[in-house]
């Protein structure tokens, strides 16, 4: 048996060795740094490929924490590698090596760099302590396809240089300081940009998006430390925009205006922290509809984060999206004394909600309080009226005993459902606000909010696994 396995491995090695060097080099370049280096042990022919294949140089916290001497290896790798460098990811303690970064970025080995990520290990609440982005980072503008900058001050020089990024497809700016003019200039120089993520940046009060290629935009605001932060986001002209992702329900901005986004399919998380939301000519103020005149037929996924089970607010949004397929409701914590107890909304068949007739197939309720009648009525409303509903997933924010779910089952089981095929799944878990969503750039995901449950830590501790209950 052992001899057969050894022969099989040898045959596989022979087959791979028949491939042209260019193909083998491409294979090596797709591997992580450690795995790529290990290919030298496969055969003699593979050994020179590692030094000539496109390099993915990833220096992360794990490596730096083991020994500071690894930092000294970076210039050695860059000087000795004979091939181009495709990716340079540096996650570092900025105080230890900031003065060296400029030299690394000036290396000829990085001349055709496609992906650059600079992420300081530490980020200070005081934005005055942020280091300026190394000027050498700007020299890659002609070739970069992916750029991620975290915890830097981006000087106005970026705007004055009118840099062009003809190949840039993904851009992430997180906890950076940058002026409005510099950011607008940077974005106007990205004719191929498909995804943009802006997280907790300072210096931008108003951002106007006008892009013919942008498909996904993720954003959130952090106002805890003062300064100028994003207060108004305007989608002026984005014909290809499919996703508008507010990554934190409490992370603003105060005003969002969607003027032209004819392909918008995924929107969320919406919350009352957004003081004013314009969807064409439809206006919401703190989740309350002021006017309902525009309908968006392209919208298929909506994520809403209300304070308590406010059916009126949710229904007003549903009226805007007649073809909605999936609804996620992430309840925010609220004192039980002011829950919407009288929230048993009556459905008027003469004025039906369009998405209830043919399209709404999935409803997910997170942080659900099954002991409160307002939450029970909230779930009942969809069971009684959504004719196309296939599944409803309900997650409690805490560990619950069997009796808790048995009580909910008894209240929901006997309902006369509009859709006889609707399945209800109950589980306990951890309070979840979906702030873990990190899929702004993953355009392959059909629904970036369709993620596995975190699970209940107490159930795992008791050896119960991820227990679910069906209704």
Provide a role label for each language-model segment.
Residues 2-210, ...:
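Leucine-rich repeat
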Residues 1-18, 454-471:
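CRL adaptor-proximal regions
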Residues 85, 113-116, 144-147, 168-173, ...:
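Conserved hydrophobic position(s) of the canonical leucine-rich repeat
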Residues 386-427, 433:
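C-terminal interaction modules of eukaryotic adaptor/scaffold proteins
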Residues 45, 137, 161-164, 183-186, ...:
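C-terminal per-repeat helix/turn "cap" of leucine-rich repeat
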Residues 56-58, 89, 117, 148, ...:
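Conserved positional slot within leucine-rich repeat
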Residues 317, 363, 382:
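Hydrophobic, well-ordered secondary-structure elements that form the walls
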